[in-house]
Amino acid sequence: SNAFSAIFDSNLTSIITGIILFNFGTGPIRGFATTLIIGILISFFTAVFLTRLVYEYFMNKDKWQNITFTTGLSKNLMQNVHFDFMGRAKTWLTAGAIAAVVCIGFLATRGLSKSIDFTGGRNFKVQFENEVEPEQIRELIADKFGDANVSVIAVGTDGKTVRISTNYRIQEEGNNVDSEIEAYLYEALKPVLTQDISLETFIDRDNYTGGSIISSQKVGPSIAEDITTSAIWSVVLALLAIGLYILIRFRNIAYSIGSIVALAFDTLIILGMYSIFWGILPFSLEIDQTFIGAVLTAIGYSIN
């Protein structure tokens, strides 16, 4: 009976974040939220009901009477181990405060590497026949696109595919703007295309001969603003919803406030780490809708 309440609370808080994620997410994010909720419900059903049935069945047949859940290694692994967390509360609080200040400082000064989901712009995933350096590709495109923001990151591990993000002419409307930008991209990347391919081949999503665009995405400024607003609200509502559930469940405002502060701290540390290390680590730390989904999932599990 004591175990059930802990299992129920931990699963319900994760479902709360899944529901919020479904309501504020789009496309694949909603799919992830649906999968998360279904997975939690099935896991809860099997852990609480089916597992109990199996154990009762075998025990009623006088089997598994001496079953244990330890091994020779784990049985004595934590014997006589005592961590005096509360005795060193000032140390942990000081370390946490320093970490929070550092993260806030980096977020305020360096910010985050935002994807076009939050800035608006175009993504082009381009595959080459030979390995290329992202910085080399960025310089070629920057010369052609002038003052527009251009970022290039490697995709995969073969070194032949990159994702190009730019806000070049994103404010312009018209039927020919997209095709003109693809033509500019073709001209800029000619030095690294291995064959004398035509523009038609380069923009053909099904033809990878000599290097070509294999996918593209456009997010307009108004859509990017809506996504940004939804992302902020989803995180705030997740914190408040879990805090409200804790208040209703345990009837103690201190528990509710403590849970919100702890979850907000965890979220701040995640954002701070991304702010500190983007551009330093050899892989992308770009913030997009998938990242927001990961943060909400972390919030749901962190409360446990």
Map each language-model feature to its residues:
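A structural signal for conserved, well-ordered secondary-structure elements
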Residues: 1-304
